[in-house]
Curated annotation (Swiss-Prot):
Family in the record: Belongs to the CINP family.
PTM info: Phosphorylated by CDC7 but not by CDK2.
Lineage: Eukaryota, Metazoa, Chordata, Craniata, Vertebrata
Protein name: Cyclin-dependent kinase 2-interacting protein
Coiled-coil ranges per UniProt: 73-107
Amino acid sequence: MEAKTLGTVTPRKPVLSVSARKIKDNAADWHNLILKWETLNDAGFTTANNIANLKISLLNKDKIELDSSSPASKENEEKVCLEYNEELEKLCEELQATLDGLTKIQVKMEKLSSTTKGICELENYHYGEESKRPPLFHTWPTTHFYEVSHKLLEMYRKELLLKRTVAKELAHTGDPDLTLSYLSMWLHQPYVESDSRLHLESMLLETGHRAL
């Protein structure tokens, strides 16, 4: 009797348990990647703010020195310009390093979304036309994990493109108002929608990373 019971076990359970474990790992990875993104975003804003302050400071010095045309002031102007260029280059390199870090995070987000899509395709192959599929955890169908992952991915993909533009323009603009607008864009991340945190927390709750 016992042997017969063992013989009735289908291969579905181990396939789904592997899928559930992978999706749970992905949810934790999403959480960790977003935390790392926020840390880099804050660091990038500090650097961008330093770039803005440096440029505004130079503009103010230029206005003051326009009132003086002595040889001494000319020599001092060249010295200040050289120091400014060196400092600006250093800050721009720091901002580029931050962008490189954000790019690596976004690539990892793409892999998470791709993996979740693959799990959905595996489940479709496994169940075929069957409409009733048991949820891997509590209530979410597997496809919902992909929908949430894809939505988060698109937010951060667009945000990364915006930050690249901001970093490029910030180093070249001489307009203080435009500079402040770029800083605001970097800080407030307009493409990361307000419900992104809700999506993440819901996924963590569904997969058991948060207590019900």
